[in-house]
Amino acid sequence: MSSNPFIGLRNWIRGAQQWYLTTPKRALQEAYEAALKIRAIELEHFDGQPISPLNLPVGEVSSYFETELKQLLKTIRMRMMEFRASRQILPLAPFQSPPTPVNEGINGATETYTVTATVSSTTAEPSVYEKLRVIDATLNRYKRQREKELDALARPSLSRQDPQQRQQAAALDKIAEDSLYLSEYISDDLTSDSKLDSSSFIPRSILRTADRFRRELNSDEATEAEVVRDFRTSKLRTRLAVRFMLLLVILPLLTQQISKALIVSPLVNHFKAVGQIERIINSQLEDNILDELARFENKIRFESLVSNVPIAPEEIQNRIREKAIELSTEYQKELIEPLKNILSDALGFTVFLALVFTGQRQLAIVKTFLDEVVYGLSDSAKAFMIILFTDVFVGFHSPHGWEVLVNNTLEHFGFPRNEDFINMFIATFPVMLDTVFKYWIFRYLNQISPSAVATYKNMNE
């Protein structure tokens, strides 16, 4: 009886060892089962097509399937990471000979994926090769589906498309459905905005209005489905665009603040010598400290003169010495503060660039979203926004705002105030900005909304 605890401990250790040794097999099996669950949902509810928010009905059904898909894909990715990491140190059963694919070529991969997913679920124990093939096919399929959705969201809504644009969009959808690798089949000629902006004898606004009347009078179910799909696309586009714009603002700011407090500040504080560089660059800091100390000394002496009980000279000297020590501490902090700002701003800017370079498709969606918002405004609203924007940045009172902005920027990076540089900047940059505004109005807004330009001229006069 006394050996029971040791037997239990030995069994527990043996079970833990067995669990550890079977980690690759267990992780692969969980990823494989998640892939089969996705395939089962596709066959049961989506006629074998990928699960897409553009094809889901609005409401709780859409939320349920989106959440289920995200959880299953996350399970696959996490288990495959666990599988790859554990495979470096733990053995796994050798690969069996790969099964013969059903078809070769572009569409063969999709057919092989379907057959493998359905057949493997009925066999007793699929090989490692079959499991990996099903998992890879699932991940690749939804990667292409995600790219297809982002491309669809980057296109204008139906209300802003003319018939030619709609035909080209339909051609892109057909290519995306038939191709295995989306990027190899989409031509730049089809996606170029310059092709869509070609001039025509009949204004495109008239063509869009006529096409909208045709679609509204058409009782075809396909037309209604197209309108519903356009609404879902617009809803999803708004959500993704707002989320990405918030990421572009919040994530770099958080990186700048957190890195400055946790990484940059402790690192720079250990190197006091860096303050000597700032002392040479910006001598105004020392002048400000001396001026503040002089004002404090004059204030103490003035209080001593007007007081009924004069302050003793020793007390005055002690107060001045304490103030000098306090100002010296602040002076040392101000000397190294610009370097902290530069390093933390560089980290935040790096995060911003990383988001921009890795989110090219999201940027296209943001551009389409902003086009929908700006060009959807009335002519009076467009003219009002243009006048407000130009008056704030290049108007009569804008030099005062630019002066404050440039001065704060120089102070943030530890440079002394330079009146010549500030005056030169104010004399050149707003002028260039005003030129850009006028060129945009002449080049783009005059073609898209001539009435808005006329309203702007009348309001500006």
Swiss-Prot record:
<dbReference type="GO" id="GO:0015078">
    <property type="term" value="F:proton transmembrane transporter activity"/>
</dbReference>
<feature type="transmembrane region" description="Helical">
    <location>
        <begin position="421"/>
        <end position="441"/>
    </location>
</feature>
<keyword id="KW-0997">Cell inner membrane</keyword>
<keyword id="KW-1133">Transmembrane helix</keyword>
<keyword id="KW-0375">Hydrogen ion transport</keyword>
<feature type="transmembrane region" description="Helical">
    <location>
        <begin position="386"/>
        <end position="406"/>
    </location>
</feature>
<keyword id="KW-1003">Cell membrane</keyword>
<comment type="similarity">
    <text>Belongs to the CemA family.</text>
</comment>
<keyword id="KW-0812">Transmembrane</keyword>
<keyword id="KW-0472">Membrane</keyword>
<feature type="transmembrane region" description="Helical">
    <location>
        <begin position="339"/>
        <end position="359"/>
    </location>
</feature>
<dbReference type="InterPro" id="IPR004282">
    <property type="entry name" value="CemA"/>
</dbReference>
<dbReference type="GO" id="GO:0005886">
    <property type="term" value="C:plasma membrane"/>
</dbReference>
<feature type="transmembrane region" description="Helical">
    <location>
        <begin position="244"/>
        <end position="264"/>
    </location>
</feature>
<protein>
    <recommendedName>
        <fullName>Proton extrusion protein PxcA</fullName>
    </recommendedName>
</protein>
<comment type="function">
    <text>Required for H(+) efflux immediately after light irradiation to form a rapid H(+) concentration gradient across the thylakoid membranes. Together with PxcL, contributes to transient H(+) uptake following dark to light transition.</text>
</comment>
<keyword id="KW-0406">Ion transport</keyword>
<dbReference type="Pfam" id="PF03040">
    <property type="entry name" value="CemA"/>
</dbReference>
<keyword id="KW-0813">Transport</keyword>
